[in-house]
């Protein structure tokens, strides 16, 4: 497991909103330790037995917090993430999509400088199977096992996790890094953590067209990775210049093309699955 486990104490920013309340219940049902919530103007109330504060600073004065998850509307989401980082919260999971790109550029830089780790935006979050879920993924498809997943896609992640669970391989930690062009944590940031994690025996890297994160990850794998990695690239049939579902899934010139990603994976010795079921076959093969 990496980053989170059943002891991780979680703050929910935007806990009183519709999504915030719904997912707080889902996370609590999964066993996640939610210690506090924040919604400006709603301090002193409770949501599902969780105390609500007006500010993150106030919440951390009353509770030990290891991670924050953010369900705040797009115009205020980057500021919410910065508020968490300034309060010293080490892990920040930003679910919100549609955050202005310039807001994200600023937030990512500042959060890094403050020493916190940002996952997202526009991501499903992070789950350590059967331990804790800090996100919006369907918890029941994640069975505890041997494979780490890092993904730019939400739904493909759930399908891959379900397939690995059904095959008896299961997952350790799964991180949805988000589908936007500017995100806080990339494949390359997480690979070293899985590389050192005693429970993870193989890693599935679910990329998609657009950007160069997959290429950078492949270069890192080639030079440093001790464990087998299996790749998958979503959106391989997409035409150039057309955004496919995610803001980050757009091919500009020769950067972000499926060919460029497949070439990088091939050079790093990463086998690439064409289907979700093939991910399972390749992981089985890699683990012997």
From Swiss-Prot:
Q: Where does CoA bind?
A: 16-19, 42, 95-97
- Listed GO cellular component terms? succinate-CoA ligase complex (ADP-forming)
Record SMART domains: CoA_binding
Q: What is its EC number?
A: 6.2.1.4
Q: Name one GO molecular function term.
A: succinate-CoA ligase (GDP-forming) activity
GO aspect biological process, one term: tricarboxylic acid cycle
Q: What class of enzyme is it?
A: ligase
Keywords noted in UniProt? Ligase, Nucleotide-binding, Tricarboxylic acid cycle
The positions annotated for binding substrate are: 158
User: Where do the catalytic residues lie?
Assistant: 246
pH dependence, per the record? Optimum pH is 8.0-8.4.
Q: Which SUPFAM superfamilies match?
A: NAD(P)-binding Rossmann-fold domains, Succinyl-CoA synthetase domains
Which InterPro entries has this protein been placed in? Answer: Cit_synth/succinyl-CoA_lig_AS, Citrt_syn/SCS-alpha_CS, CoA-bd, CoA_lig_alpha, NAD(P)-bd_dom_sf, SUCC_ACL_C, Succinyl-CoA_synth-like
Catalytic activity annotation: GTP + succinate + CoA = succinyl-CoA + GDP + phosphate; succinate + ATP + CoA = succinyl-CoA + ADP + phosphate
- In which pathway does this enzyme or protein participate? Carbohydrate metabolism; tricarboxylic acid cycle; succinate from succinyl-CoA (ligase route): step 1/1
Presence of keyword Protein transport:
no
Functional note = Succinyl-CoA synthetase functions in the citric acid cycle (TCA), coupling the hydrolysis of succinyl-CoA to the synthesis of either ATP or GTP and thus represents the only step of substrate-level phosphorylation in the TCA. The alpha subunit of the enzyme binds the substrates coenzyme A and phosphate, while succinate binding and nucleotide specificity is provided by the beta subunit. Can use either ATP or GTP, but prefers GTP.
**What is the protein's quaternary organization?**
Heterotetramer of two alpha and two beta subunits.
Q: Which family does it belong to?
A: Belongs to the succinate/malate CoA ligase alpha subunit family.
Protein name as it appears in the record: Succinate--CoA ligase [GDP-forming] subunit alpha
Q: Tell me the organism.
A: Thermus thermophilus
